[in-house]
Structures are given as structure tokens and as C-alpha cells.
Amino acid sequence: MLTIALPKGRIGEDSLALFEKIFDTKFEFGKRKLILEAGGFRFMKVRNQDVPTYVYHQAADLGIVGLDVLEEKRLDIMRLLDLGFGRCDICIGIKAEESLDFSKPSYKVATKMENITRDFFSKKAIPVEIIKLYGSIELAPLVGLADMIVDIVETGETMRQNGLKPALKIMESSAFLIANKNSFYQKKAQILHLREQMSKVLYGS
């Protein structure tokens, strides 16, 4: 049996829909249930940011999670397949009336994604102070906490509603199938077969 960590929310729902299409079986978590055993799989419903942790520690053989989370977590796990759904961008956001300007000596940047943010500005040789927040990131520039934010953008509507605008895309993200390295070698045939089935449904190959 393969154990698969799925994030709560849209990516998790899209993942189960993909499994239903592949195996012609209903995969549905019971009310308030965090574990689902069906069709020869054990699915675990966890927080988005925790999926790589469950996979890294082999509490799950496989996981499905956004590339942004993988880039931020930086754990030693295998990326097997870009699933193509759950697409979003990681963008710098600024006040709607401002222009993006990197001429100041340094900047304050509010974000949940410290590593992605630090890497981007480091490569540009732009000095920044990163302010780690856990929610309501859009508020930071409006109250003078930060000059700009780095956040996930799907349509940009949340930023616009809060007087901000996406000014620069840092990276694109979509859902990836990931594997624990030990699990991959112990269950290689099973995992590769599943990857092939998923790829066939998604991409026809």
C-alpha cells in the first residue's frame, strides 16, 4: 500500500479527482477524517506546508504539493512529475499607486516565504530586511510595516482589493508529485507505474 500526503484545499481536491479518473473509484474523506484508505492507497490530509515534511520523514511515501512549498522547504525529496494544476505565481506586490523601484539603499519585504524571497533579492544584490508574517500579508505596505510584499498570486484580485498590485513575477508554481527517496527505491515499480498512469491521464503520455 502506498501512503500519499495530500494538502487540504484545491490541490488536494484536484489530486483526488485525478485518482478517481485513473482508477474509476470514488476517493472521498469522511467528515473530519484525516486518513482515507481506498483502492490500495492510504491518503493523509495535512496542511499544505507540511506535505514535504511527511514525505521527507517517510510518514508518507508520496505527496502532492505546490512547487512554491518545495522551493521554500528545501528538503531532500524526489520530484517525480509536474501535475500542471494548482497553478499560481509568486510575485512582488506594491501599493497600486507606486512603481517598482530598486534604487533605495535597502527595503523591507513582508512575506511567508523567507527562502524564496531571500534568494531572489540576493541574486539581484538588493539589500532587504525580510519580515516574516503568517497571514494578511497585504496589510504590511498599507501600514508602513514593509515597502513591498512577496506572496502567492492567482488572479491578483486579493491584492487589488487591498490597494496593491502585482509588480514583478518571481516564479511560477504548480502541483508536483513528490516521493521519499527510501520509499522510491523500496516501492519503485509501484511508484513508477502510478507516475505513468498519472502522466497518461494528464498529458496523454
UniProtKB/Swiss-Prot annotation:
GO cellular component terms given for this protein: cytoplasm
A GO MF term: ATP phosphoribosyltransferase activity
Domain of life: Bacteria
Function text: Catalyzes the condensation of ATP and 5-phosphoribose 1-diphosphate to form N'-(5'-phosphoribosyl)-ATP (PR-ATP). Has a crucial role in the pathway because the rate of histidine biosynthesis seems to be controlled primarily by regulation of HisG enzymatic activity.
InterPro entries: ATP_PRibTrfase_cat (IPR013820), ATP_PRibTrfase_CS (IPR018198), ATP_PRibTrfase_HisG (IPR001348), ATP_PRibTrfase_HisG_short (IPR024893)
EC number: 2.4.2.17
Catalytic activity: 1-(5-phospho-beta-D-ribosyl)-ATP + diphosphate = 5-phospho-alpha-D-ribose 1-diphosphate + ATP
Family stated for the protein in its record: Belongs to the ATP phosphoribosyltransferase family. Short subfamily.
Oligomeric and partner information: Heteromultimer composed of HisG and HisZ subunits.
Organism: Nitratiruptor sp. (strain SB155-2)
Broad class of enzyme this protein falls into: transferase
Origin organism lineage: Bacteria, Pseudomonadati, Campylobacterota, Epsilonproteobacteria, Nautiliales
Compartment(s) of residence: Cytoplasm
Pathway(s) it belongs to: Amino-acid biosynthesis; L-histidine biosynthesis; L-histidine from 5-phospho-alpha-D-ribose 1-diphosphate: step 1/9
Swiss-Prot/TrEMBL domain comment: Lacks the C-terminal regulatory region which is replaced by HisZ.
Name of the featured protein: ATP phosphoribosyltransferase
HAMAP family attached to this UniProt entry: HisG_Short
UniProt xrefs under Pfam families: HisG
Record-level GO BP terms: L-histidine biosynthetic process
Protein keywords: Amino-acid biosynthesis, ATP-binding, Cytoplasm, Glycosyltransferase, Histidine biosynthesis, Nucleotide-binding, Transferase
